[in-house]
């Protein structure tokens, strides 16, 4: 008798306090858009900072800091491909800022975890 009352009480509490779990939309299109958004943010920040006359090292540190700050709390950070992101940044720098000698190893501090 006590076992049944305890079981009913426990099941009632479980059904009352259980929250639904929603899946995270992680389609490849969503990840590509997110990667492009990060790449565009970094590129804009880096280009604008160098145009203001700040040194390349200072512009790099500022762009990495601003990009990390803006995107650090997004749930998609665990799912993005770092090499794809870095290559996208390099391509955007070449196409938008005409920076052709940017080394990919400069982006090692661009981390969101």
State each model region's role.
Residues 57-113:
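Compact alpha-helical subdomains of small soluble proteins
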Residues 10-13, 23, 30, 59, ...:
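Acidic/proline-rich low-complexity IDRs
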Residues 5, 12, 36, 87-88:
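Alpha-helical interaction segments
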Residues 1-24:
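Classical Sec-dependent N-terminal signal peptides that target proteins to the secretory pathway
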Residues 17, 40-41, 90-91:
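Processing junctions and N-termini across compartments
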Residues 24-75:
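Short N-proximal segments of mature Sec-exported proteins
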């Amino acid at each position: 008798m006590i076992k049944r009352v305890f079981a009913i009480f426990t099941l009632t509490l479980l059904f009352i306090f259980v929250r639904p779990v929603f899946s995270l939309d992680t389609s490849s299109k969503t990840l590509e858009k997110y990667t492009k958004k990060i790449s565009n943010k970094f590129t804009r920040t880096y280009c604008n900072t160098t145009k203001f006359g700040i040194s390349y090292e200072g512009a790099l540190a500022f762009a990495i800091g601003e990009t990390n700050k803006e995107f650090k709390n997004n749930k998609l950070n665990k799912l993005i491909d770092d090499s794809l992101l870095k290559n996208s940044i390099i391509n955007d720098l070449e196409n938008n800022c005409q920076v052709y000698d940017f080394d990919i190893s400069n982006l090692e501090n661009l981390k969101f975890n």
